[in-house]
């Protein structure tokens, strides 16, 4: 596996893509459940956590409408593409823990899945990747993960993070 990453020096952001290459002479074992991002954050405060999201596009009047998902301890929110339509859900989301947050973007035009959960200890976990990945790589073959961007922000205003780029 190889990771290609960019760390932004003018804002608190990082993006990366993972590459898997079979450099052997036989097929690889099955590659599945690859999470391009699997990050745990533990905010210093135990304030309310809110996931700010956008509806996807299903050709309706509420396309791309913002909405919030409160995350109580033990709560989990799963979302993603439907039937290969990557626009059926927005791949951009902002996890807000009151004193800051992180904006995550999933760059993938196929079937993707995201999960944001709040553990009982107050920590928050963000996961995203290709849904239903189940492949073997032949010698010389390479596949890549979705490109992930994360931008961390401080303060109580969720829109502050949106304007850091």
What is each PLM-predicted segment?
Residues 151-163:
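Short, Lys/Arg- and Gly-enriched loop/turn segments at beta-strand edges
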Residues 1-122, 131-133:
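Polysaccharide-binding surfaces and accessory modules of carbohydrate-active proteins
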Residues 32-35, 160-165:
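Composition- and surface-driven signal marking solvent-exposed, interaction-prone regions
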Residues 135-154:
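Short Pro-Gly-centered flexible turn/kink motifs
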């Amino acid at each position: 596996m190889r990771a290609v990453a960019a760390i932004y020096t003018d804002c608190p952001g990082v993006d990366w893509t993972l590459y898997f290459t079979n450099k052997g002479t036989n097929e690889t074992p099955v590659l599945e459940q690859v999470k391009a991002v699997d990050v745990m954050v533990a905010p210093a405060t135990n304030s309310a956590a809110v996931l700010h999201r956008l509806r996807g596009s299903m050709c309706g009047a509420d396309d791309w409408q913002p909405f919030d998902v409160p995350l109580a301890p033990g709560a989990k929110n799963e979302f993603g593409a439907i039937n290969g339509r990557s626009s059926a859900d927005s791949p951009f989301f902002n996890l807000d823990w009151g004193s800051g947050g992180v904006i995550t973007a999933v760059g993938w035009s196929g079937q993707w899945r995201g999960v944001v959960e709040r553990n009982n200890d107050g920590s928050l976990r963000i996961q995203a990747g290709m849904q239903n990945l189940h492949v073997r790589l032949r010698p010389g073959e390479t596949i890549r993960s979705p490109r992930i961007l994360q931008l961390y922000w401080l303060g109580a205003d969720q829109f502050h993070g949106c304007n850091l780029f």
